């Protein structure tokens, strides 16, 4: 396809397991304990199933889809390590329960997980990183994902889902690369299915494998093919 001039691809992590501790868990013993260890207010701390499993399992009906910040950390690390990222051809949007987190092309994602957690806590609490910046590198917008998608001049939108129509990842990536503006919707959670709100929207649903894959495995596969098609390697 060529050098990718004029191409912009947005990775959208849908229903991401990235959020602050919800109100119903703030008084839970494991939440209070982990907040004390970190020296932070529980309401300003990310929900993490590694530390908050007991209270999540007890109080959250959809606990199995929540509390996995590492999924987004690993996926963003993979994206930000790509020349497509540094050249401004790809960027990322993370759908959270607090709104949409926008990650600009070229932003360096902290390699250290604890630093990433602190960064996301800052963004979700303060609204941006750095806080108060006129041109933040990462920022939160209180907007519905579907409303955001409707506002974008997208030529192609694909929802990657193991229950979708089977398609070779190379042919899928060719369609993405041939579009000047496209969005790749990927589940940002560890288990379960997309909500009816997403599935009923009518997005083209494609499966590149036929079985469930980790979010970062999908990112790695799609991005490596795009790098080849767009002439990076």
Predicted features by range, described:
Residues 161-170, 180-193:
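Long, charge-patterned amphipathic alpha-helical coiled-coil/hairpin "stalk" segments used as oligomerization
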Residues 4-163, 227-231:
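RNA substrate-binding interface of SAM-dependent RNA methyltransferases
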Residues 174-177, 217:
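RNase H-like, Mg2+-dependent phosphodiesterase core
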Residues 167, 171, 207-210:
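Adenosine-cofactor binding site in Rossmann-like domains, unifying the SAM/SAH pocket
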Residues 24-26, 171-172, 197-199:
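Short coil/turn segments at secondary-structure boundaries
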Residues 190-233:
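Structured adenosyl-cofactor binding patch, chiefly the S-adenosyl-L-methionine
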Residues 154-155, 180, 201-203:
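Short, well-ordered alpha-helix to beta-strand connector turns
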Residues 19-21, 101, 166-168, 192-194, ...:
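Eukaryotic short linear interaction motifs
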């Amino acid at each position: 396809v060529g050098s990718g001039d004029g191409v912009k691809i947005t990775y959208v992590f849908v229903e991401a397991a990235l959020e602050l501790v919800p109100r119903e868990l703030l008084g839970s013993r494991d939440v209070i304990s982990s907040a004390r260890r970190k020296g932070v207010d529980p309401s300003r701390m990310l929900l993490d199933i590694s530390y908050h499993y007991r209270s999540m399992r007890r109080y959250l009906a959809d606990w199995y889809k929540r509390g996995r910040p590492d999924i987004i950390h690993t996926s963003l690390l993979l994206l930000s390590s790509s020349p497509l990222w540094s050249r401004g051809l790809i960027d990322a949007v993370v759908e959270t329960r607090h709104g949409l987190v926008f990650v600009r092309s070229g932003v360096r994602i902290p390699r250290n997980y604890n630093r990433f957690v602190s960064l996301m806590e800052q963004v979700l609490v303060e609204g941006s990183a750095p806080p108060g910046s006129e041109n933040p590198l990462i920022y939160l917008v209180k907007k519905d994902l579907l409303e955001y998608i409707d506002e974008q001049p997208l030529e192609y939108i694909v929802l990657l889902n193991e229950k979708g129509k089977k398609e070779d990842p190379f042919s899928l990536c060719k369609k993405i690369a041939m579009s000047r503006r496209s969005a790749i919707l990927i589940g940002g959670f560890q288990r379960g299915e997309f909500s009816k709100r997403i599935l009923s929207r009518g997005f083209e649903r494609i499966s590149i494998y036929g079985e469930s894959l980790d979010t970062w495995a999908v990112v790695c596969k799609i991005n490596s093919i795009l790098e080849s098609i767009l002439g990076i390697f």
